């Protein structure tokens, strides 16, 4: 479900050994967007209670990024997400937004 949710299925099917393909250190043979997808899948596979992300989809195109954000923020998932991102779509999916400037909270709003 995690691999499907972060849209890695077709990429994994294209690998010579599928999930058993050996990846070089730091994933140097992978695109930056696929690296982010792998990291996202790994972060959710064990269904944690809390997720911390920093620009988790910034290397993906907007449509794919938004679809993955929709999946990560779906109501069926019972985790709390704390995210720092420049992508405004995260705001649409949030119930609380904290804005910081120069290390200080300048806005704390519940939606």
Residue locations for each model-derived region?
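Conserved "ABC signature" C-loop
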Residues: 1-22
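Hydrophobic anchor residue at the start of the ABC signature
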Residues: 40
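A short, proline-enriched helix->beta-strand linker immediately N-terminal to the Walker B motif
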Residues: 45-49
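Catalytic Walker B motif of ABC-type/P-loop ATPase nucleotide-binding domains
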Residues: 51-55
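Conserved D-loop/post-Walker B switch-helix segment of ABC ATPase nucleotide-binding domains
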Residues: 58-71
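Conserved catalytic loops of ABC-family nucleotide-binding domains
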Residues: 71-85, 91-92
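H-loop (His-switch) and adjacent beta-strand-loop-beta switch element
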Residues: 93-110
């Amino acid at each position: 479900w995690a691999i499907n949710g972060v849209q890695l299925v077709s990429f994994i099917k294209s690998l010579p050994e599928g999930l058993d393909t050996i990846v070089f250190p730091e994933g140097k043979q992978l695109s930056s967007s696929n690296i982010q997808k792998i990291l996202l899948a790994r972060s959710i596979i064990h269904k944690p209670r809390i997720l911390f992300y920093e620009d988790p989809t910034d290397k993906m195109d907007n449509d794919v990024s938004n679809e993955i954000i929709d999946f990560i923020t779906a109501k069926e998932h019972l985790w709390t997400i704390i995210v720092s991102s420049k992508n405004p779509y995260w705001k649409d999916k949030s119930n609380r937004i904290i804005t910081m400037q120069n290390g200080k909270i300048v806005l704390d709003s519940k939606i």
